[in-house]
Amino acid sequence: MPMQGAQRKLLGSLNSTPTATSNLGLAANHTGAPCLEVSIPDGLFLSLGLVSLVENVLVVAAVAKNRNLHSSMYCFICCLALSDLLVSGSNMLETAVILLLETGALATRTSVVQQLHNTINVLTCSSMLCSLCFLGAIAVDRYISIFYALRYHSIMTLPRAQRAIAAIWVASVLSSTLFITYYDHAAVLLCLVVFFLAMLVLMAVLYVHMLARACQHAHGIIRLHKRQTPAHQGFGLRGAATLTILLGIFFLCWGPFFLHLTLVVFCPQHLTCSCIFKNFKVFLTLIICNTIIDPLIYAFRSQELRRTLKEVLLCSW
């Protein structure tokens, strides 16, 4: 039925190519090769999305409430929370609409479903791009605060941060509109993959350089106080562990999704790739998990923000 086809489109334009989908059916029929498909229950997916939604709403509310948090750094953190909020919210909306359509609780025309499909895809893609951009912006902000500490407040002024934020949002919306419109072109998917790799390299280079400077500074303090080297080694190990966790979480949560896009371009008809395509919802779930972890890494470690968060929660009761 036409409506059933429209319902399936809500699963996302980037899920797989038509060639890959049709070939998947042939592969199963002719070879019977087993595919490892991890099923993510809709209830679990929606629950994770709800946790992310609540967490990031609290971050946005705390930053908005406390004027002491209206600095460039917290503006970037707030925008990261807002983009993560949209990532989880758009995926929850898509899943909820699919469930309502499949159960017959929501009946509408195919054209309306198609428009909703396009809107959700643009919202999801733009919020994902924003999330990646603001992770990079936070890394740049921290880098400047360490290497240009005396000039930090003159470099990272609030108006400059606001202009950067506006540019990121506008560029993300325009780019996502083009990506969703031309999603069946290999160049578009490769652009997304290259963008992810660029953000990964940027964050790795900046944070490794910051770690090296911190270790150098700690070594200087130790030499000044004539302490033993194990303390310096312990600091270096802790810093390396923190850096590994930060970049590791980023790569593990985002990497599979962009690996999926890469395989769609290079091996849409291969049986192994077709099996990977069946786990698309797992990759989305990992991104949702990243939106849950981001506030723990970037926001809730701030004592000022935690104090404001307590005030927000107390005022809400």
From Swiss-Prot:
Keywords: Cell membrane, G-protein coupled receptor, Glycoprotein, Lipoprotein, Membrane, Palmitate, Receptor, Transducer, Transmembrane, Transmembrane helix
Molecular function in Gene Ontology: melanocyte-stimulating hormone receptor activity
Record topology, Cytoplasmic segments: 64-72, 141-163, 212-240, 301-317
Chief localisation class: membrane
Residues that span the membrane, as ranges: 38-63, 73-93, 119-140, 164-183, 192-211, 241-266, 280-300
Matching InterPro entries: GPCR_Rhodpsn, GPCR_Rhodpsn_7TM, Melcrt_ACTH_rcpt, MSH_rcpt
Membrane topology: Multi-pass membrane protein
Annotated function: Receptor for MSH (alpha, beta and gamma) and ACTH. The activity of this receptor is mediated by G proteins which activate adenylate cyclase. Mediates melanogenesis, the production of eumelanin (black/brown) and phaeomelanin (red/yellow), via regulation of cAMP signaling in melanocytes.
Subunit and interaction comment: Interacts with MGRN1, but does not undergo MGRN1-mediated ubiquitination; this interaction competes with GNAS-binding and thus inhibits agonist-induced cAMP production. Interacts with OPN3; the interaction results in a decrease in MC1R-mediated cAMP signaling and ultimately a decrease in melanin production in melanocytes.
GO-annotated biological processes: adenylate cyclase-activating G protein-coupled receptor signaling pathway
Record organism: Saguinus oedipus
Name of the protein: Melanocyte-stimulating hormone receptor
Gene: MC1R
